[in-house]
Amino acid sequence: MADQESDKSIEIWKSFKLIKGLESARGNGTSMISLIMPPRDQVARVTKMLADEYGTASNIKSRVNRQSVLSAITSAQQRLKLYNKVPPNGLVLYTGTIVTDDGKEKKVTIDFEPFKPINASLYLCDNKFHTEPLNELLESDDKFGFIVMDGNGTLFGTLSGNTREVLHKFTVDLPKKHGRGGQSALRFARLRMEKRHNYVRKTAELATQFYINPATSQPNVSGLILAGSADFKTELSQSELFDPRLQAKILNVVDVSYGGENGFNQAIELSAEILSNVKFIQEKKLIGKYFEEISQDTGKYVFGVDDTLKALDMGAVETLIVWENLDINRYELKNGATGETVIKHLGKEQENDQSNFHDAESNAELEIVEKMPLLEWFANEYKRFGCTLEFVTNKSQEGSQFCRGFGGIGGLLRYQLDMRTFDELSDGEVYEDSD
């Protein structure tokens, strides 16, 4: 199933698209209401405030503007009636009359609970929607794990934004190397190795305890940094005792001069650049894995809109990879003559070709029932196909190659699939209903 990290990045992307759409909307006069309520605010307080605002707005001299403002306040009041209390993450409400691209007026009302708590309170009537407070939703709150390990002990910590937290630390008393000769030398060496092994095992077990969420069995951090002054950190990273789910999350192994909290601070400084580029690194890793499947011709990959959608329908896609600026729209078209509905995915050039909006056999015109960016459709529907959805940029070399060479859409599959077989089947129209 889709992991939490992937879900969160999709929510951020949805919020970004919504904010951009709201930002560009404009209205006549001051008939556009922006209302943001933080968690634990009272619906009754805002309802009373809107009633007071209604009284004030009744005195606006311009009849057209007065009616627009009163209409927007009424819409806000009606929408608030749907809520008994403010949702746990707060409530965002935008309502008013906007002017569309072709100069027509259109009423819009958008209300939603943000995907994480919003710490802002706002009420404004203007000729635009105010989305500035929503920008905090777009800020990454990725959490990173740190394991600082040396010959004296280990510290487990996390870093999220500028907040660092020490989860646990313990000390260890390891025997030092010494020059005693004779038969005791081997025994001492064996004891020393045994204690080292136990130390690494304890650290590995605690790492699983702190950095794996027991509810999801997935890491609760976006990445791991291993730090230390001796070679314990390297030993841990390569150890079979270290949880493979965490091994996959290692971003960096750094040398620090100290152990404990001083070592933690130094590790944060030394990893600053890597942490700021973590999305970039994850993207390179993901697309690198995709290219590896292709170069080895494993059959566990798919690319292009049609093949990717076929594989999705079969439940074969484990990770759906899509360029964040993919410019393809999903059309639901209806044949007026037969009542049949078809789905088409068209790019800009294809949209200009009118033959795509006519039935190939009868030349009957196809009516547009729904038009939606394919990206948006994926963001809403991906969970239905049991896959994770990853948006990638074209800023890395790998990302650019994925967009140019593979059309910016593809997937890693759960099992081997030869899409050519399916193309031949569909060409032969084997999928026709027998009844």
From Swiss-Prot:
GO terms for cellular component: cytoplasm. Keywords: Acetylation, Cytoplasm, Growth regulation, Protein biosynthesis. It comes from the Eukaryota. The keyword Acetylation applies. It is found in: Cytoplasm. Gene3D superfamilies: 3.30.1330.30, eRF1 domain 1 (3.30.960.10), eRF1 domain 2 (3.30.420.60). The keyword rRNA processing does not apply. InterPro entries: eFR1_2_sf (IPR042226), eRF1_1_Pelota (IPR005140), eRF1_1_sf (IPR024049), eRF1_2 (IPR005141), eRF1_3 (IPR005142), Peptide_chain-rel_eRF1/aRF1 (IPR004403), Ribosomal_eL30-like_sf (IPR029064). One of its GO terms (molecular function) is translation release factor activity. The modification N-acetylalanine is found at A2. Disulfide bonds: none annotated. PANTHER family: PEPTIDE CHAIN RELEASE FACTOR SUBUNIT 1. Plants silencing ERF1-3 show increased elongation of the leaf petiole. Belongs to the eukaryotic release factor 1 family. Heterodimer of two subunits, one of which binds GTP. NCBIfam families: aRF1_eRF1. Directs the termination of nascent peptide synthesis (translation) in response to the termination codons UAA, UAG and UGA. Modulates plant growth and development. This is Eukaryotic peptide chain release factor subunit 1-3. The lineage of its organism: Eukaryota, Viridiplantae, Streptophyta, Embryophyta, Tracheophyta. The gene is ERF1-3.
